[in-house]
Amino acid sequence: MKQTASLAWALAPVVASDFEALLALRLRAMRDSLTQLGRYDEARARARLAEGFAPESTHHIEVQGQRVGFIVLKHLSHALRLDHFYIDPPWQNRGIGAKVMRWVCDQADAELLPVELCALKNSDANRFYLRWGFAKVGEGEWDNDYLRMPVTPSVRAVRAFWAALQARDWPAARACLYDGVETVWWTSGERIAGADALIDVNAHYPEGWTIQLLEVEHLQDGRVMSLARVDH
């Protein structure tokens, strides 16, 4: 049993005979968004859920023994595919979805796999996934496609370093570096040897500069590549 601040939640297995209950929950969760698009159709919803229905990849989301949602998470060769993720409307906005998404992201990070999914256009789910680090990578007539790359400890350290620089928190930035770090500014070719020297250079920039972290990627050889825009 996993704990939230106020609710205990758990994942429970699904069997084939649960299909009708899952469909009813999906219809409740999607009714408003689909109606706004003029796409609410129970027959279409049934076909969509039945397509590729795999009980072994599906879990009920339970709170104190009550079923409040379900999730379909499939392990593909290249990614985790989040096919369905719904919280029953009476249980929404209680932090349950965030706790389940944390579980999904932790799995993906542990396996160094991206998470892919699609979300209905104009639904609140789009903002939810963006907050969780998903990037929009495509769109169809009715859905947006999203991808979240895995976050490793080294990626977290790189992000923490850039955030500390932006905040001018020099002790925090220094804590992200090892003593013998060497830095090369690509634009000028300038080399900076040592963590203290790198912090000193950045500390002399005037206040008001901004950092936009454009991309952080974990490379196959274990290194992390980051691309940042610095305006000063």
Task: Give the role of each language-model region.
Residues 10-24, 138:
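A short beta-loop-alpha structural element at the N-terminal edge
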Residues 27-50, 189-190:
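Conserved GNAT-fold acetyl-CoA-binding loop/helix
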Residues 108-120:
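Conserved GNAT acetyl-CoA-binding A-motif
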Residues 66-74, 81-86:
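Conserved beta-strand in the GNAT
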Residues 170-222:
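A solvent-exposed, acidic/Ser-Thr-rich amphipathic alpha-helical stretch
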Residues 50-60, 67-69, 207-210:
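A short helix-loop-beta-strand connector motif used in the catalytic cores of GNAT acetyltransferases and
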Residues 87, 93-106, 131:
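Conserved acetyl-CoA-binding loop-helix of GNAT-fold acetyltransferases
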Residues 98, 121-145:
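Conserved active-site alpha-helix within GNAT-family acetyltransferase domains
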